Amino acid sequence: MTIKVGINGFGRIGRIVFRAAQKRSDIEIVAINDLLDAEYMAYMLKYDSTHGRFDGTVEVKDGHLIVNGKKIRVTAERDPANLKWDEVGVDVVAEATGIFLTDETARKHITAGAKKVVLTGPSKDNTPMFVKGANFDKYEGQDIVSNASCTTNCLAPLAKVINDNFGIIEGLMTTVHATTATQKTVDGPSHKDWRGGRGASQNIIPSSTGAAKAVGKVLPELNGKLTGMAFRVPTPNVSVVDLTVRLEKAATYEQIKAAVKAAAEGEMKGVLGYTEDDVVSTDFNGEVCTSVFDAKAGIALNDNFVKLVSWYDNETGYSNKVLDLIAHISK
């Protein structure tokens, strides 16, 4: 069965979700809603400064996109309730505007005829969050779910492996995070986050993130045990998590590496990766795993206190897991 998907919001994540869907036989994008006009939408899809040219044909006909010969309905509705998803048979909406992140607001997609909705960001209410490699097995048929954040998608699988094998007493996370669309090219007004208004290409910017606390929502056994912060850095894509934890069960760094490697080659294949190469951030541009453990970068102070490092393409990895969640809730 092919799952018919509508995308609301054609920004960074909306477009990368679209690109990733072209490589899957189980998912078909049938509609896109954004306030951009179709010609500009086609241009934004064709050319990407980070991920290169679109691998396929993109045309515009009668105000709609024709991608690889298939028509995709284009609309420009501000209110999701008016989207008439049922007219094009949409099963699941990828809600990628960053605006409709509660059950109440996202439910407008259901009103408009969609069966289910996946939020491509952490929910702002109690809408359940699901992370592949952490808690997909806890899905119970809810019609609106969240794919959490890109950083939670990196942290949760690694934290689960460490906690399952050695037990986490407590931990702190830092994500060294690539620039995102909310930042400023030069210093500009940012009333809620003064540091966040400083020029993105000129600064390392400390920032808050709910990613570590959100792990406690997808892995309740870690609730209250993790928190963290972010440094925004002047790179266009690919971020890295630094997780420093105290372990219940003593373990050498070699034992930790072995446990992560076993998970990466076993039950978490395709989610958690493992490398012993001398890698840097650009080596992960286009990486579909949401967390790639860097065995050489981590360090242990002793057998109970360790720093672990894991890379993620905050656009590609996350967008691929949005599609995995869409497929999972459509079974």
From Swiss-Prot:
It catalyses: D-glyceraldehyde 3-phosphate + phosphate + NAD(+) = (2R)-3-phospho-glyceroyl phosphate + NADH + H(+). Its EC number is 1.2.1.12. Keywords: Cytoplasm, Glycolysis, NAD, Nucleotide-binding, Oxidoreductase. NAD(+) binds at R12, I13, D34, R78, T120, N314. InterPro entries: GlycerAld/Erythrose_P_DH (IPR020831), GlycerAld_3-P_DH_AS (IPR020830), GlycerAld_3-P_DH_cat (IPR020829), GlycerAld_3-P_DH_NAD(P)-bd (IPR020828), Glyceraldehyde-3-P_DH_1 (IPR006424), NAD(P)-bd_dom_sf (IPR036291). PROSITE patterns: GAPDH. D-glyceraldehyde 3-phosphate binds at S149, C150, T151, T180, T209, G210, R232. One of its GO terms (molecular function) is glyceraldehyde-3-phosphate dehydrogenase (NAD+) (phosphorylating) activity. The record marks H177 as: Activates thiol group during catalysis. The keyword NAD applies. Gene3D superfamilies: Dihydrodipicolinate Reductase, domain 2, NAD(P)-binding Rossmann-like Domain. Pfam families: Gp_dh_C, Gp_dh_N. It is found in: Cytoplasm. Homotetramer. Belongs to the glyceraldehyde-3-phosphate dehydrogenase family. This is Glyceraldehyde-3-phosphate dehydrogenase. It comes from Salmonella typhimurium (strain LT2 / SGSC1412 / ATCC 700720).
